[in-house]
């Protein structure tokens, strides 16, 4: 049995929706496993073009499905207790635009607790297969280093870092849990994608040049900006830039590219859902907080929204130009050539 143990610390506050059967919400194994599956697809999908069926087969071999058991056991133990939500604490932090729904649901009582920055969690991965434990470890690394956890996780909440790892796998794979420079962060992105291909036994072939219908790291842009004086400054800088871009730099109908629902958009049903292809979080580089922006480009935005007039991926990519005019932005990955 291969066992890998990690201690993870929150960089930004982590918010979870209430579960009726619990006194307060917790970061639990199913939520971490679900997030790891997403990032596995983003890594492995970079090698399969638009072959969603093949990607699903590989994913099920690691995480299981309704027809086959998962080959990796994921255990999550909170080492910190959640704190009761006090909306006044966030009132002067200048994050009202990107965290508007936290304020809304907090007032309704749908969100009552959260994990403040500095909260810690233990994550243990177990598998009888060395190949599976490596792929699961890569997925967890990507989740922590590139993604986030919880409600509004694509807008700055739930950013994490690995503070301790009892893991021979990470060392064997040549991945670090601390980034001493932007170049080291950049090299790590290339490394995690290369190693994924090596373990899967596939290459980034010539047939994998067109945009797939699902999100992959290959067809994404990754930028960082900063450093900020503190995490709240980084969050506020993105909040202000994002708000300015959506409200004053693009037309209302063009906002659709940043996710659904959009309740005041003609011709688009209000009940349609589509998670934003733009992920914003905070990453520590050289011990300082940096904003991290990832934009995932796909061939299909939503099966019921096909109009190129409404869905314009250039609106998403042009956000780079806008935020670069306001903040010191460094591109660390550029897989999108559209």
From Swiss-Prot:
Compartments, as annotated in UniProt: Cytoplasm
GO terms, biological process: defense response to virus
Coiled-coil parts of chain: none
UniProt superkingdom: Archaea
Keywords: Antiviral defense, Cytoplasm, RNA-binding
GO molecular-function terms, A-Z: RNA binding
Listed Pfam families: Cmr1_like_C, RAMPs
GO cellular component, one term: cytoplasm
UniProt cross-references to InterPro entries, sorted A to Z: Cmr1-like_C (IPR049498), CRISPR-assoc_prot_TM1795 (IPR007522), RAMP_III_fam (IPR005537)
Keyword Cell membrane among UniProt keywords: no
Quaternary assembly: Part of the type III-B Cmr ribonucleoprotein (RNP) complex, an elongated RNP with Cmr2 and Cmr3 as the base, with Cmr4 and Cmr5 forming a helical core along the mature crRNA (39 or 45 nt in length), while the complex is capped by Cmr6 and Cmr1. The 5' end of the crRNA is bound to Cmr2 and Cmr3, while Cmr6 and a Cmr1 subunit (Cmr1-1 or Cmr1-2) cap the 3' end of the crRNA.
NCBIfam families linked: cas_TM1795_cmr1 (TIGR01894)
Family: Belongs to the CRISPR system Cmr1 family.
Function of the molecule: CRISPR (clustered regularly interspaced short palindromic repeat), is an adaptive immune system that provides protection against mobile genetic elements (viruses, transposable elements and conjugative plasmids). CRISPR clusters contain sequences complementary to antecedent mobile elements and target invading nucleic acids. CRISPR clusters are transcribed and processed into CRISPR RNA (crRNA), formerly called psiRNA (prokaryotic silencing) in this organism.
Protein name: CRISPR system Cmr subunit Cmr1-1
Organism whose genome encodes this protein: Pyrococcus furiosus (strain ATCC 43587 / DSM 3638 / JCM 8422 / Vc1)
Lineage: Archaea, Methanobacteriati, Methanobacteriota, Thermococci, Thermococcales
């Amino acid at each position: 049995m291969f066992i890998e143990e990690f201690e993870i610390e929150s960089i930004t506050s982590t918010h979870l929706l209430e579960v009726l059967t619990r006194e307060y919400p917790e970061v639990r194994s199913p939520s971490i496993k679900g997030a790891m599956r997403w990032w596995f697809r983003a890594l492995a999908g970079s090698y399969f073009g638009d072959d969603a069926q093949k990607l699903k087969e590989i994913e099920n071999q690691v995480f299981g499905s309704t027809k086959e058991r998962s080959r990796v056991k994921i255990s999550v133990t909170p080492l910190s207790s959640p704190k009761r939500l006090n909306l006044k604490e966030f009132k002067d932090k200048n994050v009202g635009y990107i965290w508007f729904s936290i304020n809304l649901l907090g007032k309704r009582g749908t969100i009552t607790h959260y994990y403040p920055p500095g909260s810690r969690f233990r994550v243990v991965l177990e598998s009888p297969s060395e190949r599976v434990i490596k792929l699961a470890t890569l997925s967890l690394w990507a989740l922590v280093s590139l993604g986030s956890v919880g409600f509004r996780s694509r807008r700055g909440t739930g950013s994490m870092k690995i503070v301790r790892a009892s893991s021979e796998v990470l060392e064997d794979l040549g991945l670090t849990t601390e980034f001493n420079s932007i170049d080291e962060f950049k090299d790590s992105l290339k490394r995690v994608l290369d190693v994924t291909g090596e373990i899967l036994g596939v290459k980034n072939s010539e047939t994998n040049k067109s945009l797939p219908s699902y999100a992959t790291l290959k067809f994404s842009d990754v930028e960082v900006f900063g450093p900020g004086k503190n995490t709240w400054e980084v969050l506020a800088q993105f909040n202000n830039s994002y708000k300015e871009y959506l409200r004053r730099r693009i037309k209302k109908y063009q906002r659709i590219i940043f996710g659904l629902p959009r309740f005041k958009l003609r011709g688009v049903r209000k009940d349609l859902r589509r998670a934003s292809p733009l992920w914003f979080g905070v990453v520590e580089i050289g011990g300082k907080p940096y904003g991290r922006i990832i934009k995932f480009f796909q061939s299909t935005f939503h099966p019921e929204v096909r109009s190129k007039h409404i869905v314009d991926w250039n609106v998403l990519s042009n956000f780079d130009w806008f935020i670069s005019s306001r903040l010191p932005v460094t591109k660390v990955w550029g897989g999108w050539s559209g």
